[in-house]
């Protein structure tokens, strides 16, 4: 692997060259819109939302980068059916893995020969890794950079806030109160670091029974919308729960490609329109 790419246990030694912060700044200048997808807790489907928002934007013809900064639990390549390892170009910059002509990916999963090996890093190393994901990657000109962050308000979202000051947050929650309590912490985090909150998405909001057609509120309903209203934050929409979404993620198939007219596909398209608006 190239000298300046991320390695297990730390960051590879760099040859004398451009300042890494300046490289990151130059890379970001070529990206129009940056969104970090956050959640207050795990298990709310945040990564699935990240993947599907990126796909919805790419399907509309935008050039999209999907950056996985969930360094300890990277899943995006698997969810998109991508199994290759990252390579480097002649300038020793990492080349994102292409999913399509309009979507490319970078993730720790694509840097690890043994994907069962744990990443054991402290904050400064995570900061350096994310900075490399921005500045040492041949992103080129992008309309959108979608950043999938781990749950909570730790090192990774803080690093994004520091390195990408114009990033906007999309906060994902489910309707139940335990998730809503944590989303309020995400709102507080964004306001403390002065990150704009673009909006809130209520995921897993209702399940249409395939037998009787009745909508079953597995996790309650309306909590995300109410929280958005109470905090003066735009509510971007509801995404229903569908077992097919889980199946597609497990097998690396694009749900939106397989179910083009699903209410879920249409909901992601509507949110993508708001992001592009």
Give the predicted meaning of each segment.
Residues 1-41, 85:
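Extreme N-terminal, non-catalytic leader segments
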Residues 34-70, 187:
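Walker A/P-loop phosphate-binding motif and the immediately C-terminal alpha-helix
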Residues 44-52, 73-77, 149-157, 179-182:
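Short glycine/serine/threonine-rich phosphate/pyrophosphate-binding segments
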Residues 63-65, 69-115, 120, 127, ...:
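Phosphate-binding loop that captures ATP/GTP phosphates
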Residues 106, 130, 149, 162, ...:
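Glycine-rich phosphate-binding loops of nucleotide-dependent enzymes
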Residues 112-160:
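Phosphate-binding/switch loop-helix module in NTP-utilizing enzymes
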Residues 143-144, 150-248:
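Conserved catalytic-core segment of NTP-binding enzymes
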Residues 251-262:
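C-terminal boundary of histidine-terminating zinc-finger modules
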């Amino acid at each position: 692997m190239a000298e300046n790419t991320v390695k297990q246990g730390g960051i590879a030694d760099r040859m004398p060259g451009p300042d890494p912060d300046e490289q990151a700044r130059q890379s970001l200048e070529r990206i129009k819109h940056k969104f970090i997808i956050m959640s207050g807790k795990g298990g709310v489907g945040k990564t699935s939302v990240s993947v599907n928002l990126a796909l919805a934007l790419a399907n509309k013809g935008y050039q999209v980068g999907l950056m996985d900064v969930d360094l300890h639990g990277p899943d995006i390549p698997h969810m998109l059916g991508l199994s290759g390892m990252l390579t480097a170009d002649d300038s020793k910059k990492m080349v994102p893995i292409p999913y399509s002509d309009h979507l490319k990916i970078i993730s720790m999963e694509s840097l690890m020969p043994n994907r069962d090996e744990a990443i054991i890093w402290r904050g400064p190393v995570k900061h350096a890794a994310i900075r490399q994901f921005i500045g040492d990657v041949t992103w080129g000109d992008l309309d959108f950079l979608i950043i999938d962050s781990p749950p909570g308000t730790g090192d990774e979202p803080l690093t994004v806030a520091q390195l990408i000051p114009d990033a906007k947050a999309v906060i994902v929650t489910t309707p139940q109160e335990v998730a809503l309590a944590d989303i309020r912490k995400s709102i507080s985090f964004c306001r403390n670091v002065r990150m704009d909150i673009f909006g809130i998405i209520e995921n897993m909001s209702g399940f249409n029974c395939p037998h009787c057609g009745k909508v079953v509120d597995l996790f309650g309903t309306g909590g995300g919308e109410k929280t958005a209203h109470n905090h003066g934050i735009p509510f971007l929409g509801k995404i229903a729960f569908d077992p097919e979404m889980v199946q597609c993620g497990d097998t690396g198939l694009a749900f939106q490609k397989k179910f083009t007219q699903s209410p879920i596909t249409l909901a992601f398209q509507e949110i993508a329109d708001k992001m592009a608006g």
